[in-house]
């Protein structure tokens, strides 16, 4: 082999070596680009997953709020229906109270004649029937004589001094009060002690 042939072979071998190095460098750069691209894709996928998780959490929260609101509406409706049942006769019972008052006033008078006594007994039975019907429907009588005055249950009509009783004690009842299922229909009209 001549020198020139050796030189050509060496040049070709250098060219092959250089080409191999360039190719390796290109592959390395291309691999880095591919790795960077995969990392970017991974980051984007993570961001998308995070956004979807946030949306899912928001929808869950909205669903829970809607469920709670529906439960509150249901409970409120049940309470309203229950109150309508309990207090539906309130107006009716208020209108009956003057009738009871009139009957009770009539019964306070003493009667001597035998016929009048029989009539009084009939009125007493009528009054008892009326009171029983009201009780059956949840109307309770308030006759607070001797109790402490409570402005939620009683209406003070007059005050009198009486050293035998403590202040704010109910001395007398002008007109009985009535409650319907725990709610005041009419406050008792009373005289209280004020020393």
From Swiss-Prot:
It is found in: Cytoplasm. Pfam families: GrpE. The keyword Iron-sulfur does not apply. Keywords: Chaperone, Cytoplasm, Stress response. GO terms for molecular function: adenyl-nucleotide exchange factor activity; protein homodimerization activity; protein-folding chaperone binding; unfolded protein binding. GO terms for cellular component: cytosol. One of its GO terms (biological process) is protein folding. The keyword Transport does not apply. InterPro entries: GrpE, GrpE_coiled_coil, GrpE_head. Homodimer. Belongs to the GrpE family. Participates actively in the response to hyperosmotic and heat shock by preventing the aggregation of stress-denatured proteins, in association with DnaK and GrpE. It is the nucleotide exchange factor for DnaK and may function as a thermosensor. Unfolded proteins bind initially to DnaJ; upon interaction with the DnaJ-bound protein, DnaK hydrolyzes its bound ATP, resulting in the formation of a stable complex. GrpE releases ADP from DnaK; ATP binding to DnaK triggers the release of the substrate protein, thus completing the reaction cycle. PANTHER family: GRPE PROTEIN, GRPE PROTEIN HOMOLOG, MITOCHONDRIAL. This is Protein GrpE.
